[in-house]
């Protein structure tokens, strides 16, 4: 049943949710205005990689990030986060571990150019593999796949172009997705949602975009009537 509902919503429905309902996308759009495009993309990837063990809702954390860096000159991402994280309201845990991760990824981020951003946006699996290799972590780990999702948002904003996410990249296993999966099956979240992705022809990162805001209580009133009806059906199944 859930595969059928996701198929009905489709990639275009997921795109509507991403661009009009997901607060993370709204926060990035706000931050991007007046900011250097490459620096914006670098910051978004870095922030996604430290978006775990939060001390508040993910939506609030991304708005905190966007407001903090709006109009701010960033000399190095590491020095900026050394100041930002200890004073953050929504990301106060494991600060040293997160700073170490920023330090590891910054040399790679500093190589990004407009050309390489376009190249990675054309094939997001390349970025996925590159980030995992630099950090020496499993490429299916939550923050690595999540960083590709947020890169997709950032690239879409700066390039004014929509490219769907690749089917191969699994869903980020965050608390909301894990809880929902337990309600539906005994399978591992990434395996279950990959199966749903193939059945519905909607890539896992777009499935995440559909589910995650709805599980967080997002309202769907502004969706077009046909999509709104489909989302309300899905909400009855997942909430």
Swiss-Prot record:
Reactions the enzyme catalyzes: 2'-deoxyribonucleotide-(2'-deoxyribose 5'-phosphate)-2'-deoxyribonucleotide-DNA = a 3'-end 2'-deoxyribonucleotide-(2,3-dehydro-2,3-deoxyribose 5'-phosphate)-DNA + a 5'-end 5'-phospho-2'-deoxyribonucleoside-DNA + H(+)
Annotated active site: 142, 174
MF terms (GO), sorted A to Z: class I DNA-(apurinic or apyrimidinic site) endonuclease activity; oxidized base lesion DNA N-glycosylase activity
InterPro entries assigned to the protein according to its UniProt record, in alphabetical order: AGOG (IPR016544), AGOG-like (IPR015254), DNA_glycosylase (IPR011257)
Region listing for Helix-hairpin-helix, in residue ranges: 118-182
Gene3D superfamilies named among the record's database cross-references: Hypothetical protein, domain 2
One of the GO BP terms on file: base-excision repair
Positions with a binding annotation for 8-oxoguanine: 24, 51, 62, 146, 172, 208, 212
Alphabetical keyword list: DNA damage, DNA excision, DNA repair, Hydrolase, Lyase
Superkingdom, taxonomy of origin: Archaea
EC number: 3.2.2.-, 4.2.99.18
Key word DNA damage present: yes
Entry keyword Signal: no
NCBIfam families: PRK13280.1-2
Family named by the database record: Belongs to the archaeal N-glycosylase/DNA lyase (AGOG) family.
Domain notes: Contains two alpha-helical subdomains, with the 8-oxoguanine binding site located in a cleft at their interface. Contains a helix-hairpin-helix (HhH) structural motif and a Gly/Pro-rich sequence followed by a conserved Asp (HhH-GPD motif).
Protein name: N-glycosylase/DNA lyase
Native organism: Pyrococcus horikoshii (strain ATCC 700860 / DSM 12428 / JCM 9974 / NBRC 100139 / OT-3)
Taxonomy of the source species: Archaea, Methanobacteriati, Methanobacteriota, Thermococci, Thermococcales
